[in-house]
Amino acid sequence: MTTYTNADLHCHSVVSDGTLEPEALAARAKANGVELWALTDHDEVGGQQRAAAAARAQGMAYLTGAEISVTFAGTTVHIVGLGFDAQDERLLQGLARTRGGRGERAQEMAEQLAKVGIPGAYEGALHYVGNPELISRTHFARYLVEAGVCKDTSEVFRKFLIEGKPGFVPHRWASLGDAVRWIQDAGGVAVIAHPARYRLSANEEFALFSEFKQHGGQGVEVVTGSHSAAEAVSYAAMAQEFGFAASRGSDFHSPDESHTDLGMLPPLPGHLTPVWDLLAHRIQPAH
């Protein structure tokens, strides 16, 4: 079994809410020493063929990927699927249903922002959208920075785009069980993405991990761009407690916005099973 010292299994391209094309991401990953890579666009696999070809051209091994938005106990949680068949019909249908409604939500967001003195946000956000089916809060955030409303996208989210703020509009995503089933039925492994981001209570987090495991989930992101060193230690312990494999991914979106660049992450703790060990038969070789 091949050992990878630098795997990055979580990032986004212009196909969803990143700013780089899949080929540019692959080149950046290679330049940063990545050996095993996955493109994980939100609720979409349209960039997979390009990403796999770019990985081969750069001499990197590749796993298919997607980040699926789910609703759990009233909270939006992200599940990364890895190593699946990107042409699986049930997966494609499920992702299409999950993408549905984003346009209507975006119109509502723009209406709410107009009420607080920010007109034209929908049209502005569209300038940043690579895939019209995947217009998101991030695209609105980029426009509001361009318009001078806020200094950076983090400030936009804090002031306008999180729950309780004027531009937030909820959306009903897939269920946790649906997302895991789509991934597994397509031959992949489901992973809880950046669990510290959800700010769940200890009881809520235990419930999420328990239900995820009951549905057949097999992994958790232990090392990721938004986790502190202490959080990585905490989720390493939870991975052991639940018998999960550990994943590693930067969640890179843009050179101008992301705190962690592709591949520039601490290593996984050595006592954990890397998620790619579960997917050795699904890894597309570097050459």
What are these regions (language model features)?
Residues 54-210, 271-287:
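Extended substrate/RNA-proximal surfaces in nucleic-acid metabolism proteins
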Residues 4-6, 93-96, 240-242, 267-270:
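A general, composition-driven signal for non-globular sequence regions
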Residues 229, 250-287:
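Catalytic core of soluble alpha/beta enzymes
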Residues 1-75, 161-162, 174-175, 180-182, ...:
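An N-terminally biased module of ancient metal coordination in phosphate/nucleic-acid-related enzymes
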Residues 20, 127, 158, 259-261:
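Residue-level detector of alpha-helical segments with a strong bias toward transmembrane helices
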